[in-house]
Structures are given as structure tokens and as C-alpha cells.
């Protein structure tokens, strides 16, 4: 693995951290309720200033996920180029769609604020939701697909990763984040609003750790 591939892993880790910070600003509330995709009442607990900060941080950082997925795919590549290329294409497409999703959250949130202030915008909120929520479902479906590739490739033992890394697939980690929230744990309240980013922070961190002795300078 070249130093360049390793650098892209750090970029992926940085993306997960920044988008996670932005999404935390956009969606975290100590009262929970982030699962409400009809009325989005939890947005009333979040100030317009915090929403604006989260919007810009997350949207500007989200495209860096594509670089991070290139890092993961290059570490899977020794196990088979076709599947590693499919892993990258699916992951990159998913996070391009995910950027569109997170870029619309600010506008949904401010519409909720206007409704709370007395504006008759319920139909507009419904329209926003109908054109926003499908994007995150595409992202979640993509996580299932890349996780299948992840498990298959790593389990064969020919990638840059040790076989135990197969356990830490994005889908399994994401399911763990959801379980922590819906089982009412204290940590779940914090990780659920940023579940996708917390998942990938773990994936990129483990990738960098598991391949830490493999970096070399490329002379090609």
C-alpha cells in the first residue's frame, strides 16, 4: 500500500469527523426524536445558528467520503479487482446521494421553525420530506451492498486487511448504532443522529490501524 493510499484513509477519517460534527449540529437534541420523519418536531429544539453551522460543515465535507471509499477499495483490491471496483462505485454513488440528502436538512428544519411560528407550511414540509427521505434510504441500501462485498472480500484472506476486519462492516456497525438508540441507552442518544458518520469513523480508523505497517512510497 502506498503512502498516497494511506493519506486517503486519513481524508476519509477527517470526512467522517467533519460530517459527523455538522450532522450533530443539524440533528442532535437531548430530547431525541430524530426518527420523526413526518413532523420533524425535534428541529424546534435546535437554533437557526446551529443549523446553519451544521449545514455548511456537513455539505462541504461530505464529498471527501468519496476519497475515503477509494482508500477502502484499494485495500480490498488484492482480493479481486472487480468487487473492489464495485465497492468503490457503490460507495461513491451512495455518498453523492447522501450529500444531496444532508444538504436539504437545513431547509426542512427552517420550515419546521416557520410552522412553529404560525406559518401554514405543513404541505410544503411534506413535499420536502417526500423528496428528501428517499435519498437516505438509498444510502442505507448501498451500505448493505458494500458490506456484502466487504465481508466476502476480507473473509477470503487476500486483501490488505486481516480477516477479523470482516466483522466491522458498515451495515453491522450502523445496525449497532440504531440498536443503541432504540434500546434507550445513554450513548445511543448521541450516536444515532450521526450514525452513518460514527460508523465510518470506526471503519476508517480500523482500516488505518490494521494496515499501519504496510505503507511504502510509490515510485511508479
Predicted segments with their positions:
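Hydrophobic, aromatic-enriched alpha-helical segments typical of multi-pass transmembrane helices
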Residues: 1-220
